[in-house]
A protein has these predicted regions:
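A conserved ligand/cofactor-binding region detector
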Residues: 1-172
């Protein structure tokens, strides 16, 4: 319970679940490992947070995890907002989204993507809403704590977000 015993914050715990549990056709062909692969890969997103990223696969999984957790939180914020309000351009009056590390930095492009692609907002309005809603604080300047993604990896894992980042760069 928070300030003056009147407020409680909600803690959301996200779990990745597969869209297909088991490929019976592959199983019946004798490819047992491949039959279970879609489920195993999906659950890997939320099974162990922040894997060793010294390999390309580790870097890719980490980026997927950061996207998954950030997107889930943003989608929940938008869902709750739309239950009470009709104009998403008013979101900054009701939501302040604070990022306290580099891990959720994908929130900018993801919020813009959700507003544009899922809710039909134009780029200029979506960018303005994101700028007004999102805040960022980092508590260290150590290079190893400041995450960066190779353009190839980022574009391969999140091609739509790469387009949005390039559009933001061109806008400014």
């Amino acid at each position: 319970i928070g300030w003056q015993g009147k407020w409680a914050n909600t803690l959301r715990l996200w779990e990745a679940q597969p869209t297909t549990m088991f490929d019976l056709e592959r199983f019946n062909r004798g490819d047992y490992a491949a039959a279970a692969e879609p489920e195993a890969l999906a659950r890997t997103l939320s099974r162990v947070l922040y894997p060793d990223d010294t390999t390309y696969q580790g870097k890719e999984l980490r980026l997927k995890q950061e996207f998954f957790l950030t997107s889930a939180a943003l989608q929940d914020i938008l869902r709750r907002f739309k239950n009470r309000h009709s104009d998403l351009r008013a979101l900054p009056k009701y939501a302040a989204i604070q990022m306290n590390d580099t891990h959720p930095a994908i929130a900018g492009p993801e919020l813009i993507r959700l507003l544009m692609d899922e809710n039909g907002m134009g780029f200029g309005d979506a960018l303005e809403v994101a700028q007004q809603c999102l805040g960022y604080t980092n508590h260290t300047l150590l290079p190893e704590a400041l995450e960066r993604w190779a353009t190839f990896t980022f574009g391969n894992v999140l091609p739509r977000h790469m387009q949005i980042v390039e559009r933001i760069d061109a806008w400014h």
